[in-house]
Amino acid sequence: MNPSLVGSEMCIRDRLQPALYISKLANGISQSNGNKFSIYEHSPAIEIKKNNDSWEIKTPTGSVITKKIIMAVNGHAESFGFFEKRLMHVFTYASMTKKLTKDQLTKLGGEKKWGVTPSNPMGSTVRKITGINGDRIVIRNRWTFDPSMEVSERRVSKFGNDQDKSFNDRFPMLSDVEMEYRWAGRLCLSLNSVPAFGEVDKNIFSACCQNGIGTAKGTLAGIGAVDLATNTDSAIVNDMKSYDAPKKLPPKPISYLGANAIIKWRELKAGKEL
């Protein structure tokens, strides 16, 4: 980590990997394709139901009927009855600071925005972001395995204390900075590290379970699902179809205790990177 870039002297090596946010990508595609398709937000699919030779996708306030479905919902594939007892639902946790003042930004120094990922996957990911809501720092660490796909506010708050410590270790000059937001986000893994890909029912194509590498593997799975749905022969489809199916997990009590014990052990091995 370059001190002149991020304002912290905790690490000495870094790798920068800029990326576009998916929302900007979707907006750009929508604007450049006129009325060829529509994007619906705040309309979660809560049920998929067979409707003659089509599928009906129900939302809280309406429904969509379609011939084909590309299902890119990661772990929530299990919520629709697919890959049952074969997907591991893992949460990671994050905190975001309040808007940094001019004085705090001066103390921090470094570039206007940056992102740092750890060499150990259990370590802390740290980002400095800037936008209409000001300059802020986001820190993400800690992991849990939760088959219910839900975590409590208490859990988020508890791990928030760990993020406060990680933040203070990296930025002692910002001891007066407070966190404004805390949250948990889902990851989906499989026991044998393979995707949940393919035609899972007639004309339902899954591009799920990215095993923690959503930007790369999710993009490939999405392209592959489109190729599969349009009967396009491609190297991506052939590669994705070459994987075994996700392995069945042990019974819940065993998988829950075992997975969380392994996570805890790996977090301990992360040392100062956490």
Where are these regions (language model features)?
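Catalytic-loop motifs flanking and including active-site residues across diverse enzymes
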Residues: Y21, F159, Q163, K217-A221, ...
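C-terminal lid/capping helical subdomain adjacent to the catalytic/cofactor pocket in oxidative enzymes
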Residues: D201-S206, Q210-L274
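Single conserved hydrophobic/aromatic residue that forms the stacking wall/gate
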Residues: M1-G7, C11-I12
